[in-house]
């Protein structure tokens, strides 16, 4: 909805000529089928509160300040057919005319499906440029520190949360503190991120008293503060760049743990299985740190194509392909790759640092805001 308002306020001519406001997946479906649909998961969440959550239809009085009701797409399930590939689309894409096209959804939702989030207690942690978490729940949770939606799977709700820096933080460290690793990558072909890990596993848990608050680009949940800043707490002259890098990996893990605990603080919410997905799972040390900080097993999938795999699964459900009659059938097609088991000795060490981490934002947010106001 904010994007529609931005177009309305900043590009009124474009707004006036707009036939439909669509998501990325809806746009592709429309180009392929000439039908304008959006899946329930995105429609009710991204366009909130323009659709009635019970009827899935636009509410005229709520749409009035934003757009006309007829400018919104029809809401249906992600696995419902959007239509079939038209002759014109077939010529442009090479797809066979008449190929069924499902409604589809966004990347994170599809990747959650590929990670088995098809029932309560199943969770995906997506390690991309940012960290995104989706946990299947039996009911909607009322907590302004977290997000909640009716999930893609009919009858399943979810809690979602996000840490604004994940892979983007490791990239910043690579570019600013490990430029020699980049140079070596050019010469040897060995990935710079792999080179950055040399010796980091020798730094003890807690990075010798160095805690990173990874709010380098503001923060989403649980603080929802675009003015939040990153902090290196406990930095001394004895720390090396290896300490700084490990502390960054730990800081993201502390953020994840803070949010997992917050989710499970709600009645009838439990985390029974975690699948980690995305580019960050290639960093085995990071995955082990997350397991040790959270005290939970972190599973990685055997198939790592992520959202595309989830899309393929939903397409199979949509056309009722044998063995894919419903979402429950998907579990048998999700195979586990590496499992990172927590070291509970390290978990106890991390609990001490977690307690400090949990207080860092509240202790400094006023100063953060003073700092950003001066810039």
Language-model features, listed with the residues they occupy:
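Short, well-ordered alpha-helical packing segments
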Residues: 5-8, 29, 114, 174, ...
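ATP-dependent carbohydrate kinase catalytic cores
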Residues: 50-154, 164-165, 187-198, 263, ...
């Amino acid at each position: 909805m904010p994007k529609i308002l931005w177009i309305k306020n900043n590009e009124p001519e474009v707004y006036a000529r707009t036939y439909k406001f669509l998501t990325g997946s809806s746009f592709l479906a429309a180009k392929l089928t000439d039908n304008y649909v959006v899946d329930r998961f995105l429609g009710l969440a991204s366009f909130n509160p323009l659709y009635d959550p019970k009827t899935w239809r636009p509410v005229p009085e709520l749409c009035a300040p934003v757009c006309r009701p007829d400018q919104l797409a029809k809401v249906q399930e992600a696995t419902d057919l959007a239509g079939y590939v038209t002759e014109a689309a077939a010529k442009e894409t090479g797809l066979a005319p008449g190929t069924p096209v499902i409604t589809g959804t966004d990347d994170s939702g599809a990747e959650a499906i590929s990670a088995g989030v098809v029932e309560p207690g199943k969770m995906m942690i997506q390690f991309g440029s940012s960290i995104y978490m989706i946990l299947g729940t039996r009911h909607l949770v009322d907590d302004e520190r977290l997000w909640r939606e009716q999930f893609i799977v009919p009858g399943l709700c979810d809690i979602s949360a996000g840490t604004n820096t994940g892979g983007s933080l490791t990239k910043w460290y690579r570019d600013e503190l490990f430029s020699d690793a980049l140079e070596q990558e050019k010469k040897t072909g060995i990935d710079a991120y792999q080179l950055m890990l040399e010796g980091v596993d020798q730094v003890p848990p807690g990075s010798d008293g160095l805690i990173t608050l990874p709010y380098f680009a503001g923060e989403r949940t649980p603080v929802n503060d675009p003015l939040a800043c990153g902090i290196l707490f406990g930095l001394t002259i004895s720390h090396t760049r290896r300490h700084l890098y490990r502390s960054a990996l730990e800081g993201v893990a502390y953020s994840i743990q803070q949010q997992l605990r917050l989710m499970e603080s709600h009645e009838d919410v439990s985390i029974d299985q975690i699948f980690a997905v995305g580019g960050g799972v290639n960093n085995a040390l990071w995955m082990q740190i997350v397991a040790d900080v959270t005290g939970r097993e972190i599973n990685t999938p055997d198939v790592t194509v992520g959202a595309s795999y989830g899309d393929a699964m939903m397409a199979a459900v949509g056309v009722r392909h044998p063995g894919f009659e419903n979402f429950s059938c998907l579990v048998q097609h999700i195979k586990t790759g590496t499992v990172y088991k927590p070291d509970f000795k390290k978990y106890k060490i991390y609990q001490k640092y977690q307690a400090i981490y949990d207080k860092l934002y509240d202790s400094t947010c006023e100063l953060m805001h003073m700092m950003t106001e001066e810039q």
